[in-house]
Structure formats: structure tokens, C-alpha cells
Amino acid sequence: MVIKPRVRGFICVTTHPVGCEANVKQQIDYVTQQGAIDAGPKNVLVLGASTGYGLAARITAAFGCGANTLGVFFERGSVDGKLGTAGWYNTAAFHKFAEEKGLYAKSINGDAFSDAVKAETIETIKRDLGKIDLVVYSLAAPRRTHPKTGEVLSSTLKPLGKSVTLRGVDTDKEIVKETTLQPATQEEIDGTVAVMGGEDWQMWIDALHEAGVLAEGAKTTAFTYLGEKLTHDIYWNGSIGEAKKDLDQKVIGMRQQLAGLGGDARVSVLKAVVTQASSAIPIMPLYLSLLFKVMKEQGSHEGCIEQVYGLYKDSLYNSEPVIDQEGRLRADYKELQPAVQDRVKQLWDQVTSENLYEMTDFVGYKQEFLRLFGFEIEGVDYEADVDPDVKISNLIQL
């Protein structure tokens, strides 16, 4: 079949297997060109390993550190000629390239929040790797079935305490408009913390620790975003921010837990990038379009792979990490420079539907968005016939 992008709202309902493979290859090439990371991890578990920052963390571990990687995610392959998800095709490509390099790569497809996936992961580590020395937590999900109660919890993107009116861009109609969001109820806040907070990360570390599969010196990190004033109402000071603050609280206990192994636990702050998760946040497409314009002009623009490679090299595996007062590892400092934020704010107030393309890098935003699904990748023939049925070698399906 010939596959073209079909976008509905903040999701692209088609995916391109060959484009996804080319996208993964570009990220691998970037890491390879940067060179090996000294004293990097050897056996790595990535939770949420199929797209965005999680995929970048897996690529950096394998191709920057020569690590064996075990990935966990919830994706869908092709059934009856229908297209699989981008994360499925990304992982098929990652496995292929890792195996060509002689690197161990295995993945578990299932609900990472469940006890069954945790148990299967532990058995796989014991059987194949013995122990792991890095756990990357990069799950972004709209819902979580609590493994102990069976309750289905949902995350919401809402402000706290009062309604908030935000500028944004309707990416379908390509118009700048204002959206008013009502404040989250306590139930919605609690649900968001349960889905996107630190409880499941803690459960993973507890389970791995109790099973004796964490190596001496094992580290764990979860990814977060802080942002600046423009995004605070909906993000850091909103329901999702409560979940991110929960990560900051839970990591303290995990740090003490891993200290017994000579290890460490840190939250890592990364810059705003286009992901399937961020494109769903009302303010983010406009903010990112402006951020891209300003950071490209200043020569400091980075995507997922540049951010994560830098995080490994400068902080996770560096004796002098970039760390803030709260103990978080920081890779977002280029985004937060006053010269960047002041310029973004200045342009923010001037953007209209009429000058959207002129004032922002909306073209770059749309391109990055489509790249998530395997489109807009240089060197890919999008007129060619493509088989949607791509198998993932060494996949454990739960």
C-alpha cells in the first residue's frame, strides 16, 4: 500500500513503517557520530521505550554505551492489513539495527502498570541479563488500571483552583485562538497524580529491588518538564504539575533505597519537544512553534535524541552532573535561557492567525509532528508500495 499522512487533531491516524525505520536510523547515526559515553550502563531497562524520549534513551544506551536493552511499551502491530502504531515500527527498526551491531535487544508489549508485566520483566532480566544497572521511566499514558485495586484512573490536563484562558493554535484549521479550561476537581487531580506521578515508578523499583535484579551502582531516572511562565498555568501549576511534583517527592525514597547499592535515583528535566504527549497539551503547539523559531535562530535547537544523549554524557554518567537545588538533573537549560524565553514571550503577544507562518516556525512544528509517525523523513520514497506487516524480533507479547 502507498501510505499518506492523515491527521485528526493531535494524532496522525496513519504511520509509515519505512519512515519510522529511517527516523530511528537518523537517531542512531547522531549518537554514533557523537562518540561513546564513558562509564555508561551495560544492561538497561526502558519503560516506555517505543517513542519520544524513551526511544531516545534506549538508542543512547545501546549505540552510545554499547548496552543490552530491554524495552517495555504498549503498542499495536499490523492486523488484517491495517497499519500498526509508530512505536511498533520504531521498535522493529531498533531491534533490527541493534542485532546488526550484535547488541541484545528484547521487548515486552503490554501494560507497564500491571503486575504481570513487572513479573515478566523480572523473569526476562534474570534469564537473559542477570542484573540491570539503569532503569529509565518514560511512560506517558491517559489511563492506568491500578494493579492493586483494579480501579481505572484517568489523567487530565487542567488548571488548579480557577479557570484559565490560554492562547493556542488549532492545528487542523491553522488559526490562533483562545481556549478556556475549567479547573480540575480533586478527583481529577488525584487521578492525574495516580497515572502520571511517581507511584508506578516506585512500584517498579520496589519490585526490581526485591527480586534482586538491580546491580551494584544501579541508577534510575524519570523524565519531567518544568518550562517557564508561559506554560506554567496549564503545566507546572496544573493537574499534570501535581503529578510531576509527586515524582520529586517519590524519588527521595528511591534515592535512599538505591544508596544501599551505591546507586542513585533522579528526576531528569528535559526541554519541550514535539511528542504525541506534548501535542495534546492546548498551549504546546504554539509555544513549540515559537520556541523552534527562536532556538533555531540562536543555534541551540535540539530534539529528543540530542537532549537525551546530552543527559547521559553530561549528567547521568558524569562526575559533575548538571543538577539543580532540588536534586534534579537538568538538560533544559538552553530552553530556559532569558534570551530565549524573553524573545518567545515577545513574539507570543504578536502572533495572529494571519502572521502565524511568518512569526513562528509552524512549518517546523508540523514537520516534527509528522516525523513522529514516519512522514517528512528525508530519503524516503512516499510513493512506493509498503508492506504494513512488520514483525518485531525477540518480542514478548503479553
Curated annotation (Swiss-Prot):
Transmembrane regions: none
GO BP terms, alphabetized: fatty acid biosynthetic process
EC number(s) per entry: 1.3.1.9
Keyword NAD: yes
Alphabetized Pfam families for the sequence: Eno-Rase_FAD_bd, Eno-Rase_NADH_b, Enoyl_reductase
Example GO molecular function: trans-2-enoyl-CoA reductase (NADH) activity
Site residues, Plays an important role in discriminating NADH against NADPH: 75
Protein keywords: Fatty acid biosynthesis, Fatty acid metabolism, Lipid biosynthesis, Lipid metabolism, NAD, Oxidoreductase
Gene3D superfamilies reported for this sequence: NAD(P)-binding Rossmann-like Domain
Reactions this protein catalyses: a 2,3-saturated acyl-[ACP] + NAD(+) = a (2E)-enoyl-[ACP] + NADH + H(+)
Keyword NAD: yes
Coiled-coil ranges from the UniProt annotation: none
Active site: 235
Pathway info: Lipid metabolism; fatty acid biosynthesis
InterPro entries for this protein: Eno_Rdtase_FAD-bd_dom, Enoyl-CoA_Rdtase_cat_dom, FabV-like_NADH_b, Trans-2-enoyl-CoA_reductase
Binding positions for substrate per the UniProt entry: 225
Binding site residues for NAD(+): 48-53, 74-75, 111-112, 139-140, 244, 273-275
Function of the molecule: Involved in the final reduction of the elongation cycle of fatty acid synthesis (FAS II). Catalyzes the reduction of a carbon-carbon double bond in an enoyl moiety that is covalently linked to an acyl carrier protein (ACP).
Subunit structure comment from the entry: Monomer.
Matching HAMAP family: FabV_reductase
Family note: Belongs to the TER reductase family.
Stated name of the protein: Enoyl-[acyl-carrier-protein] reductase [NADH]
Organism of origin: Pseudomonas fluorescens (strain ATCC BAA-477 / NRRL B-23932 / Pf-5)
Lineage, opening ranks: Bacteria, Pseudomonadati, Pseudomonadota, Gammaproteobacteria, Pseudomonadales
The gene coding this protein: fabV
